[in-house]
Regions:
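Signature of N-terminal electron-transfer/Fe-S-associated modules in redox systems
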Residues: 1-144
């Protein structure tokens, strides 16, 4: 897929404005809050600071494409643990959590905290976020 945009355009704006993928949110614009997290080749990446030119030939996954089979295991765990409040940070949090579980199937609390450190939640649901990640990890282990 290609879009007509300058190479220095942040990926976030291409996703939202050119492709209509509005699940990825704008939070701070400087890569500090995590609301714009997407996956580039499976790695959690801040779309607001990633120029379009850095995505050439790479696989981009947004919250809309996280699972081809309905809700992703992390999304189901999010609901089960009642994580969302306002929901604004949710897509970025889920994308970071999914990337963590892809590389660390059974993370410790410390690994979760480290991976999620760059994702801010104004509602302060950090304990539920951690619980949801543990639930998703356990669910993934049970279904293997």
């Amino acid at each position: 897929m290609s879009v007509d945009a300058p190479p220095d355009t942040p990926l976030l704006w291409v996703l939202r404005d050119s492709l209509g993928l509005t699940g990825t949110k704008f939070g701070c614009g400087v890569g500090q809050c995590g609301a714009c997290t997407v996956h580039l080749d499976g790695v959690a990446t801040r779309a607001c600071t990633t120029p379009l030119s850095a995505t050439t030939g790479r696989r981009i996954t947004t919250i809309e494409g996280l699972s081809a089979e309905g809700a992703h295991v992390v999304q189901r765990a999010w609901v089960a643990e009642d994580v969302p409040q306002c929901g604004y940070c949710q897509a970025g949090q889920i994308m970071s959590a999914a990337a963590l579980l892809a590389r660390t199937p059974s993370p410790t609390d410390e690994q979760i905290d480290s991976a999620m450190r760059g994702n801010l939640c104004r509602c302060g649901t950090y304990q539920r976020i951690r619980a949801a990640i543990h639930r998703a990890a356990a669910t993934r282990t049970e279904t293997r």
